C-alpha cells in the first residue's frame, strides 16, 4: 500500500463543535478534510459542550500553546436541584436538593462572590493527571482522588436569564477554569446543588465565534474556512522587518529596538509575510524570536 501523501497546509480552522462528539474526534476529521500532516486543537470541549473549537493545522500547531493559555468566554445553562457525578447532563444522578425561590438580586449577589481571583478544586471528571493517569479514569472506577484547589480568575460573570430552576449565565475566565465546577459552586452558594445542561464557547483569546463553521460547511468549501496563522495574534504588536533583520531573526538572532507595546510581537518580512512570534527581553532590552514558522512561499498551492 502506498504511503499517504500529506498536504503542506498551514492555518487555523474555527470549528463550530456540535453536541455529543469529542474534540479529538472532530480534530481528526478536520485533519482528514485538509489532508494535513500535523493538527492540534487549542483546548478541548466536553462532549456535551458546543461552540468555538479552533483547529491548528501544520505550522499553526506552534502557536496552539499560546491559545491554550488564552482566556475563554462561555454561555452556560445551569440546572439547579440535581447533582451529577460529572457536573453535566451526561453524568449519573447523585442527589437532589430543593431549590430556594430565586430572584435576580439573589443571583447577582452570588455571582459577585465568584468574580476576580478564585480558588477552584478541579473535578474528578477531567484530564488532569494523577500518577500518570487522567482523573476521569479513576472517576469511572469509582475511585476518589483528593485534588488541591488551583487559582483561577473570573473576569466577568453575568446573569443572562433564569426561569424556575434553570439559570443561564455568561463567563469570561482564565485558562484552567472548569465551568462545570463553577456551576456546581454557584448552586452550592444558592443553598442547593446543580449541573450544567448546556455549555457554549464563544471566544478563545482574540478568536470569536463570528466566523466559525460546522464540519459540513468546511467539507463543502474547505479553502474558504482556512484562516491565516496570525489571526489569533492580532492583539500583539506587529513588527515589520527589513531584509537584514529578517535574516537575523530567522537565524535566531536578537534585535536592539525600542521596547514594544506588547511583550510578545508578530514578525513580518519585507514581503509582509508573517514569519513568527518575538519576545521582548526586558533585562537585556532585546527582541528575540520565540516561535518561527516554515511557511510556503507566496504563490505556493494551498489547495
Curated annotation (Swiss-Prot):
Disulfide bonds: none annotated. It catalyses: uridine(55) in tRNA = pseudouridine(55) in tRNA. Keywords: Isomerase, tRNA processing. The active site is at 46 (nucleophile). GO terms for molecular function: RNA binding; tRNA pseudouridine(55) synthase activity. It is an enzyme of class 5 (isomerase). Pfam families: TruB-C_2 (PF09157), TruB_C_2 (PF16198), TruB_N (PF01509). Its EC number is 5.4.99.25. GO terms for biological process: mRNA pseudouridine synthesis; tRNA pseudouridine synthesis. Belongs to the pseudouridine synthase TruB family. Type 1 subfamily. HAMAP family: TruB_bact. PANTHER family: PSEUDOURIDYLATE SYNTHASE TRUB1, TRNA-PSEUDOURIDINE SYNTHASE. Responsible for synthesis of pseudouridine from uracil-55 in the psi GC loop of transfer RNAs. This is tRNA pseudouridine synthase B. It comes from Hydrogenovibrio crunogenus (strain DSM 25203 / XCL-2) (Thiomicrospira crunogena). The lineage of its organism: Bacteria, Pseudomonadati, Pseudomonadota, Gammaproteobacteria, Thiotrichales. The gene is truB.
Amino acid at each position: 500500500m502506498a504511503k499517504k501523501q500529506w498536504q503542506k497546509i498551514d492555518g487555523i480552522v474555527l470549528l463550530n463543535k456540535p453536541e455529543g462528539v469529542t474534540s479529538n474526534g472532530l480534530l481528526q476529521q478536520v485533519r482528514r478534510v485538509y489532508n494535513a500532516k500535523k493538527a492540534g486543537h487549542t483546548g478541548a470541549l466536553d462532549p456535551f459542550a458546543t461552540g468555538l473549537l479552533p483547529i491548528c493545522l501544520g505550522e499553526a500547531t506552534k502557536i496552539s500553546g499560546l491559545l491554550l493559555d488564552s482566556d475563554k468566554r462561555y454561555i452556560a445553562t445551569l440546572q439547579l436541584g440535581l447533582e451529577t457525578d460529572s457536573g453535566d447532563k451526561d453524568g449519573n444522578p447523585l442527589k437532589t436538593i430543593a431549590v430556594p425561590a430565586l430572584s435576580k438580586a439573589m443571583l447577582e449577589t452570588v455571582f459577585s462572590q465568584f468574580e476576580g481571583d478564585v480558588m477552584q478544586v478541579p473535578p474528578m471528571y477531567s484530564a488532569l493527571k494523577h500518577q500518570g493517569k487522567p482523573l476521569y479514569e479513576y472517576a469511572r472506577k469509582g475511585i476518589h482522588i483528593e485534588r488541591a484547589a488551583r487559582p483561577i480568575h473570573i473576569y466577568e460573570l453575568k446573569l443572562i436569564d433564569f426561569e424556575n430552576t434553570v439559570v443561564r449565565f455568561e463567563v469570561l475566565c482564565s485558562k484552567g477554569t472548569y465551568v462545570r465546577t463553577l456551576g456546581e459552586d454557584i448552586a452550592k452558594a444558592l443553598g442547593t446543588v446543580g449541573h450544567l445542561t448546556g455549555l457554549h464557547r464563544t471566544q478563545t483569546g482574540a478568536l470569536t465565534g463570528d466566523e466559525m463553521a460546522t464540519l459540513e460547511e468546511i467539507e463543502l468549501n474547505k479553502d474558504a474556512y482556512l484562516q491565516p496563522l496570525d489571526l489569533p495574534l492580532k492583539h500583539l504588536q506587529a513588527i515589520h522587518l527589513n531584509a537584514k533583520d529578517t535574516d537575523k531573526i530567522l537565524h535566531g538572532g536578537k534585535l536592539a529596538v525600542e521596547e514594544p507595546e506588547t511583550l510578545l510581537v508578530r514578525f513580518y518580512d519585507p514581503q509582509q509575510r508573517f514569519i513568527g512570534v518575538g519576545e521582548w527581553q526586558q533585562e537585556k532590552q532585546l527582541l528575540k524570536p520565540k516561535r518561527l514558522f516554515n511557511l510556503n512561499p507566496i504563490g505556493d498551492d494551498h489547495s
